[in-house]
Curated annotation (Swiss-Prot):
One of its GO terms (molecular function) is RNA binding. It comes from Ectopseudomonas mendocina (strain ymp). This is Ribosomal RNA large subunit methyltransferase K/L. It catalyses: guanosine(2445) in 23S rRNA + S-adenosyl-L-methionine = N(2)-methylguanosine(2445) in 23S rRNA + S-adenosyl-L-homocysteine + H(+); guanosine(2069) in 23S rRNA + S-adenosyl-L-methionine = N(2)-methylguanosine(2069) in 23S rRNA + S-adenosyl-L-homocysteine + H(+). PANTHER family: RIBOSOMAL RNA LARGE SUBUNIT METHYLTRANSFERASE K/L, RIBOSOMAL RNA LARGE SUBUNIT METHYLTRANSFERASE K_L. One of its GO terms (cellular component) is cytoplasm. Its EC number is 2.1.1.173, 2.1.1.264. Residues 46-157 form the THUMP domain.
Length: 725
């Protein structure tokens, strides 16, 4: 047999260039790229070294023969022409893998059968002994690739794919193969950074694949050092002495590398279910001194190496089915960019994504991009130097083509009533604007039917205006009511200096049946606002309510102040804005319950927007039924029920006046010792049942829960503080 072989290394598509460099460095000669492969010449020692040291290859194939074929019979004869007695005992086991088609072979299973038949027929003894088939752990794994009439017949020296290092026995929902992770690290410059003593952090590490591959590189550990069974283990051409020498050298290098002071390599994962599997993987890889994995939210990611060294932040954010809808992903990418800008100045960053358009939302400019394939999914690796000159932040607002210039420059003359309304808006803006700026309030009620003939609520949401028209009583002439509304709408842009396109108008009236949940429109326009250090989503167009009850702002801020270390329960949670405040305040856990899937999806996006994960429970269900079955204990409870609620998903109708005693008794049964329950509602005729005051310590705090923008309308809601007697 020849001492020199043709070797083919297979790899994921997109890794060919990197694999070519690696293979040459490991001794492959005459190496050249092919699609998803590298081909070259090597002696057996180099082939073994490629098996042991390649971080990028899937398989190491030793080519036995190349031959032309036009039909199945020529395939059979070409395979049978190889002297298989040099490779396998007649009593040995065999597996055949066949790829490609053509020349009369249009079915890979049929092609594999012809290859198997040829080998078996060549090795069958006079006594009838012949190789058996073992698809799992054969003595010899044979590979035949058919490409445009040429058959390439090879032995698979690797056995199982080389990406299976043996440490990742537990994985998350969207695993990244080890050799692809290694390729991403190499492209990101990790070998250079590691050689300089740099750090590495992954804010969404899953079960730690990036971390482990990075540590293996930094510690000079052969990626397949711990593999016990190889494709060549029972091959008759195997030379154990050569393999033992190479394996011993690799063990010595690993021992020396692991004996060095470990680099700072840390991973953070929000999902508590992945922490122990990740740590188990690290332990199996023998890297417990090098790699540490902690539970941590993206929103609090801040790498702090022990010697203040900089390094590489690497991440494979979710980009498809594993983490919900595109909106949540958008906020996750925005949050990642925010954490990089705020906590990682001077670092390098590498973001591997199957959704490059989301990568553009991070507010950071990438200096280099590489194309990869993760299976069948085209991906990009974005390389970023986290320096201020690479930041893409701040609002850049220009007039759109369909927005007339006149909207900003020309003002129509107002009617007398319209001018009075405008004057009132400007007066309120002057008074409330000072308060809002001082308190950092972005969204507040500017006007609330201050002038009875203009029965509107006008709310400011940053540079948008949300207008709710209260339905006029039947005694008012509809034409006059319509005229006043038009006067007011004409006055609002002029008085407040906003474009008409940024005024959203709705009619508010008593909601009946399921109408309370129905969409008013379907524009799907969400905007982000800030309140008390958290970010919240509002929708000014699609629903009657915007997703943020402005009158409850003081209660939400109170909850944030009181939430540290507490178990928080939010009933009738709506879009869970109070839950976001509780999470921001350091709540140990949060549970939010609502009947509406729409609002719970909104709640999930609010949490995602702030970097909070699914550890914050969102429960869809009828609150009364849920409370009756729940056995949890909570330190802080917030209940803000609707006046009434009616849905196909619940039994009967909820009426706050009729049902509040049962509701509060159920909730107080879940309150831990020393806990506090806040109860509020907007029913203006509501009367708290006196029996509750007898059973519990009850304090009305309505006046304390009104900010200046609602002080002129003290009946907007009532609120109580409940504790156990």
């Amino acid at each position: 047999m020849s001492d020199r072989y043709e070797i083919v290394l297979t790899c994921p598509k997109g890794l060919e260039g990197l694999l070519l460099e690696e293979a040459r460095a490991l001794g492959l000669e005459e190496a050249r790229e092919q699609t998803a492969a590298v081909r070259g010449q090597a002696e057996l020692e180099v082939a073994y070294r490629l098996c042991l040291w390649s971080r990028l290859a899937n398989r190491v194939l030793l080519v036995l023969s190349r031959f032309s074929m036009n039909n199945a019979e020529e395939l059979y004869e070409g395979v049978k022409a190889v002297d298989w007695r040099d490779h396998l005992e007649p009593a040995g086991s065999l597996a055949v893998e066949f790829s490609g088609h053509g020349s009369g072979i249009d079915n890979s299973h049929f092609g594999a059968l012809k290859v198997k038949d040829a080998i078996v027929d060549r090795l069958r003894t006079a006594g009838g002994e012949r190789p058996s088939i073992d698809k799992i752990n054969p003595d010899l794994r044979v590979h035949l690739r058919l490409d445009r009439g040429e058959a390439v017949l090879s032995l698979d020296l690797s056995g199982h794919s080389l990406h299976q290092r043996g440490y990742r026995l537990q994985q998350g929902a969207a695993p990244l193969k080890e050799n692809l992770a290694a390729a991403v690290l190499i492209r990101a410059g990790w070998p250079r950074i590691a050689a300089e003593g740099g750090a590495l952090a992954d804010p969404m590490c899953g079960v730690g694949t990036f971390l482990i591959e990075a540590a293996l590189m930094a510690a000079d550990v052969a990626p397949n050092l711990k593999r016990e069974r190889w494709g060549f283990s029972n091959w008759l051409g195997h030379v154990p002495a050569i393999w033992k020498k190479l394996h011993a050298e690799a063990e010595q290098r690993a021992a020396a590398g692991l004996a060095r002071p470990p680099l700072w390599i840390r991973g953070y994962e929000a999902d508590p279910r992945l922490i122990q599997p990740g740590r188990n993987n690290v332990e199996r890889a023998g890297l417990s001194d090098w790699v540490k994995i902690y539970q941590g939210e993206l929103g609090s990611f801040e790498p702090r190496p022990d010697q203040n060294q900089k390094g590489l932040v690497i991440s494979n954010p979710p980009y498809g089915e594993r983490l919900g809808d595109e909106a949540s992903l958008l906020y996750l990418y925005q949050n990642l960019g925010e954490r990089l800008r705020q906590a990682c100045l001077g670092w390098e960053a590498a973001v591997f994504t199957g959704a490059p358009e989301l990568g553009k939302r991070m507010g950071l400019r990438s200096h280099k991009q590489y194309s990869f394939w993760n299976g069948a999914l085209a991906c990009k690796l974005l390389l970023i130097k986290v320096q201020t000159e690479q930041f893409v932040t701040g609002e850049r607002r220009t007039r759109t083509e369909d927005e007339p210039v006149a909207e900003a420059s020309s003002q129509a003359r107002l009617s007398e009533g319209g001018q009075m309304f405008a004057n009132r808006l400007q007066k309120n803006l002057k008074q409330l604007g000072k308060w809002a700026r001082r308190e950092g309030v972005e969204c507040y009620r500017l006007y609330d039917a201050d002038m009875p003939e203009y029965a509107l609520a006008v709310d400011l949401y940053r540079d948008w205006v949300h207008v709710q028209e209260y339905a006029a009583p039947r005694s008012v002439d509809p034409d006059k009511a319509q005229a006043r509304l038009l006067d007011a709408l004409a006055a609002i842009p002029q008085a407040l200096g906003v474009a008409q396109s940024r005024v959203a108008i709705k009619r508010r009236e008593r909601q009946t049946g399921t109408k309370q949940y129905q969409r008013q429109a379907a524009q799907g326009q969400f905007m982000e606002v800030s309140e008390g250090g958290v970010k919240l989503l509002v929708n000014l167009t699609d629903y009657l309510d915007t997703g943020l009850f402005l009158d409850h702002r003081p209660l939400r801020l109170r909850i944030q102040r009181e939430a540290a270390g507490k178990r928080f329960l939010n009933l009738f949670c709506y879009t869970a804005t109070a839950t976001v405040h509780a999470a921001k305040g350091g709540a140990r856990s949060t549970t939010s319950v609502d009947l509406s899937k729409t609002y719970l999806d909104w709640a999930r996006r609010n949490l995602s927007l702030n970097g909070f994960s699914d550890k914050h429970r969102l429960e869809q269900g009828d609150v009364m039924a849920w409370l009756a079955e729940d056995r949890g204990e909570y330190d802080l409870i917030f209940i803000d029920p609707p006046t009434f609620s009616n849905s196909k998903r619940m039994e009967g109708v909820f009426d706050v006046q009729r049902d509040h005693v049962e509701l509060l008794d159920l909730a107080m049964a879940r309150l831990a010792g020393g806990g506090v329950l806040y109860f509020s509602n907007n029913f203006r005729k509501f009367q708290l049942d006196e029996s509750l005051v007898a059973r519990y310590q009850v304090e009305e705090i309505s006046a304390q829960t009104l900010d200046p923008d609602f002080a002129r309308n003290p009946k907007i809601h009532r609120a109580w503080r409940f504790t156990a007697r």
